Swiss-Prot record:
Accepts the ubiquitin-like protein NEDD8/RUB1 from the UBA3-ULA1 E1 complex and catalyzes its covalent attachment to other proteins. The major substrate is CDC53/Cullin. Keywords: Acetylation, ATP-binding, Nucleotide-binding, Transferase, Ubl conjugation pathway. The keyword NAD does not apply. It catalyses: [E1 NEDD8-activating enzyme]-S-[NEDD8 protein]-yl-L-cysteine + [E2 NEDD8-conjugating enzyme]-L-cysteine = [E1 NEDD8-activating enzyme]-L-cysteine + [E2 NEDD8-conjugating enzyme]-S-[NEDD8-protein]-yl-L-cysteine. Pathway: Protein modification; protein neddylation. Residues 27-177 form the UBC core domain. It comes from Saccharomyces cerevisiae (strain ATCC 204508 / S288c). The acetylation of Met-1 is cotranslational, and not regulatory. The N-acetylmethionine increases affinity for DCUN1D1 by about 2 orders of magnitude and is crucial for NEDD8 transfer to cullins. Its EC number is 2.3.2.34. The gene is UBC12. This is NEDD8-conjugating enzyme UBC12. Belongs to the ubiquitin-conjugating enzyme family. UBC12 subfamily. GO terms for biological process: protein neddylation.
């Protein structure tokens, strides 16, 4: 009986200590931490934590950098960086995702805005960081000309895959199309 009481007190003390470690973390930050803990990244994706969800400072929202390096498709050998900015209502609202490189892609505009349905109308709190990263990878394997942010890229993809592939190769190495200079995103 004495042993049972000691175990109970020990467990209570552990619970008090663990709950006092992160008392100020919001539900959004706790969820993001859980997403990060369960993340299973493919070898073509790298993730860097810019602002940790562990920070109790609510003036700085959690930020991640995701680097996608497609190993097939039009963007093979590219290295594309994205910022993911999580607000305090995540997962009710999706994070703000911005491409940090100027690339020629039907679903990414010149300012870096990303058109991905799961980041807009198809977002659900059931989706997580793994879903977002999978969606970003999919954008490079299957660009969608039917829902474009870059209408020139979408038009070229619809007109012919060969011409689109040539334009992507040109722009990936820092070339220009229609007086727009694109960033060199070719992996060394």
């Amino acid at each position: 009986m004495l042993k049972l009481r000691q175990l109970q007190k020990k467990k209570q003390k552990e619970n008090e200590n663990s709950s006092s470690i992160q008392p100020n973390l919001s539900a959004a930050r706790i969820r993001l931490k859980r997403d990060l803990d369960s993340l299973d990244l493919p070898p073509t994706v790298t993730l860097n934590v810019i602002t940790s969800p562990d920070s109790a400072d609510r003036s700085q929202s959690p930020k991640l950098e995701v680097i996608v390096r497609p190993d097939e498709g039009y963007y093979n050998y590219g290295s594309i960086n994205f910022n993911l900015d999580f607000n305090e209502v995540y997962p009710i609202e999706p994070p703000k995702v911005v491409c940090l490189k100027k690339i020629f892609h039907p679903n990414i505009d010149l300012k870096g805005n990303v058109c991905l349905n799961i980041l807009r109308e198809d977002w659900s709190p059931a989706l997580d960081l793994q879903s977002i990263i999978t969606g970003l990878l999919f954008l490079f394997l299957e660009p969608n000309p039917n829902d474009p942010l870059n209408k020139d890229a979408a038009k070229l993809l619809c007109e012919g895959e060969k011409e689109f592939a040539e334009a992507v190769r040109l722009t990936m190495s820092g070339g220009s199309i229609e007086h727009v200079k694109y960033d060199n995103i070719v992996s060394p």
